[in-house]
Amino acid sequence: ECLQTLNGHSDWVPSVAYSPDGTKIVSGSGDKTIKIWDANTGECLKTLEGHLLQVESVAYSPDGTKIISGSDDKTVKIWDANTGECIKTLMGYEYSVLSVAYSPDGTKIISGLGDETVKIWDTNTGECLKTLNGHSDWVRSVAYSPDGTKIISGSVGGSIKIWDANTGQCLKTLEGHSEGVLSVAYSPDGTKIISGSWDNTIKIWDANTGECLKTLEGHSSYVSSVAFSPDGTKIISG
């Protein structure tokens, strides 16, 4: 049953996320704006403007006080989730920012880029701490492990990489998708990784060994988004 339809954007919406307490929803759109919605009523509470091109990815900070956004305008912006004010703009990118995520402790931001790299940023200073090189195509999805010690990234080239979040070293490369990887996520306990791909499949991987445990088939087109349920027993895909 569809409970709500949130209308307000004037272009497609490539990214949505719930606030940690579940009371709000944030959406990023091709209309260059970010909207904050009341999750219960569906009312648009705020429209955040400042990006010059499409907003590709949005995420809440773990404490729910901030929102980050990545855009085709080659910037990441940090916003105050209550006031809607832009607190910081992280610059220095040469390509689109396709994916953003917070570390579990909220002190770092990671971004996946059109230049085949992943960047790690300090949220307080706005300084780029590390650039992770190794992918051979756009990095479409990034995520931290629940304990914050590892980073995963999925590339349009078809590979998934596991990185040491402190050193930036590539620990493993997971290969098995026949086309680009559009979405990656860790299980809540950090033992598994799921990936959605242009090859219409979802794969479940062992996060320690890198072994592909299962391939889930059933979609008739590409899988652009995957996520685990909070208890780790279910997977949703779109």
What are these model-predicted stretches?
Residues 1-238:
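A detector of tandem-repeat and repeat-rich interaction/domain scaffolds
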